[in-house]
Every structure is written in C-alpha cells, then in structure tokens.
C-alpha cells in the first residue's frame, strides 16, 4: 500500500500500474438499479415560488458548479426559492451520487459539504444500498472513461443527454465491500492531492501575475 500511495499523482493520471491494481480488485457484474435507486432531479418550475413574501430559500446545484474532477464549487451554486418546504428526496444527502445528464456526465459523491442542495432535473440522483455497495466506489466507477463513452454513444441528438434508465442499466463490476473500500480510499486520496495541486497552481498564477505587473511598473 505504501508504494501505491507514494505515487498518487501518477495514479490519478491513470498510470498503467494503477489500472492494473484497480482491475485486480474488481469482481462480478451487476446492474446499478439492482443496488441503488436511480431517478431524475426536480423539475424546478413545479416547486418554484411566485410569491416573494411567502417562500423557502435553498441553494441549487447547477451544471457550472460541478467540476470535471467530481467535486462541487459551492460558490457557483445559485439561490432557489420554493413555494413550500422541500422534502429530503429533492435535496442532496450525504452518500448520494449526482450525475450530470449532459457531457461529460460527471458523477459527484455527496459529502457533508455538499448536502442540502436542490437537485434540478438536469442531474440523475443515485442512492445506493450501502449493504451491497459503497457510494464512493460507485461514484468512482461512473466516472470511468469507458462508462462516459458508453453514455455518449447511447445518446441520440446534439445534446446527448442521458436518462435515469440508462444510468440504472449500467453494469457495475462489484467486488467485496472490503475491496470497494480500498478503491474508494485510493480515489479519495488522488482527488485530495489533485485539489491541492490545483490550488497551488492558482496561487502560482496569481503570484507570477503580480510579480510581472510589479516589474512592468518599474522605470
């Protein structure tokens, strides 16, 4: 495990060693809808308030807020004013997986940080039976390039939008829960390092931009 964790960056970039290791952890196939409920999000117009004096305020998930690396930028979520208090089924819950219905079909595992966001209809919501599978593992699996390519090839029209039935019919390679946990932990470690590196890149960009501006002002 130490050797694997010492090269998390290479892991995330799909080095051959990582793919081989993950492949060894995988078991038999099972359709997602056998181990999870899969449905579309809320049609917002059905619950949107038309009365400014009588409404319930929420934060709403949107396509812009979902990053390609499977995270959510909370700052990009937007307000949603409902005509009534929404039931939990319309909101993100810890352990949920939300999948963009449009390319690149990014799947996001919902942590405490991403909970209680309104899920609109351009997302598919996957709620996994945790006695059969780990949601973190399923999120990793749905983000595989092969799965995304299959979604794209199965869609008709310019928008290439997927439906809950298509997501539910996805065949998942399902090893033991112990093996799933190993995969999920590796995936989480790689994502954490990626986020740190991306933050460092942004800081470096700002630093050099300021440095160049200062040099340019010197006479």
Predicted regions span which residues?
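Non-catalytic DNA-recognition/assembly elements of restriction-modification systems
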Residues: 12-56, 174-219
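Sequence-specific dsDNA recognition surfaces
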Residues: 33-49, 64-94
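Short, surface-exposed loop/turn microsegments at beta-strand edges and helix-strand junctions
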Residues: 50-58, 78, 90-92, 110-122
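Generic structural signal for buried aliphatic residues
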Residues: 96-99
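A short beta-sheet element
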Residues: 101-140
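A short glycine-rich beta-alpha junction/loop motif
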Residues: 117-122, 157-181
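Glycine- and charge-enriched low-complexity intrinsically disordered segments
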Residues: 135-148, 152-156
């Amino acid at each position: 495990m130490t050797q694997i964790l010492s090269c998390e960056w290479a892991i995330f970039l799909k080095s051959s060693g990582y793919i081989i290791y993950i492949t060894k952890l995988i078991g038999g196939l099972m359709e997602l809808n056998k181990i999870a409920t899969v449905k579309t999000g809320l049609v917002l117009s059905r619950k949107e308030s038309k009365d400014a004096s009588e409404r319930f305020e929420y934060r709403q998930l949107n396509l812009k807020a979902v990053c390609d690396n499977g995270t959510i930028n909370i700052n990009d979520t937007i307000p949603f004013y409902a005509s009534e208090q929404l039931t939990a089924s319309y909101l993100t819950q810890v352990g949920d997986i939300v999948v963009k219905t449009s390319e690149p079909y990014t799947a996001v595992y919902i942590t405490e940080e991403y909970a209680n966001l309104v899920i609109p209809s351009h997302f598919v919501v996957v709620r996994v039976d945790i006695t059969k599978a780990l949601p973190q593992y399923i999120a990793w699996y749905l983000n595989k390039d092969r799965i995304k390519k299959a979604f794209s090839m199965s869609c008709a029209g310019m928008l290439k939008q997927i439906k809950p039935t298509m997501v539910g019919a996805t065949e998942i390679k399902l090893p033991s829960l112990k093996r799933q946990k190993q995969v999920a932990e590796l995936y989480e470690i790689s994502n954490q390092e990626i986020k740190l590196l991306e933050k460092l890149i942004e800081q470096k960009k700002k630093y050099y931009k300021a440095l160049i501006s200062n040099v340019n002002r010197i006479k």
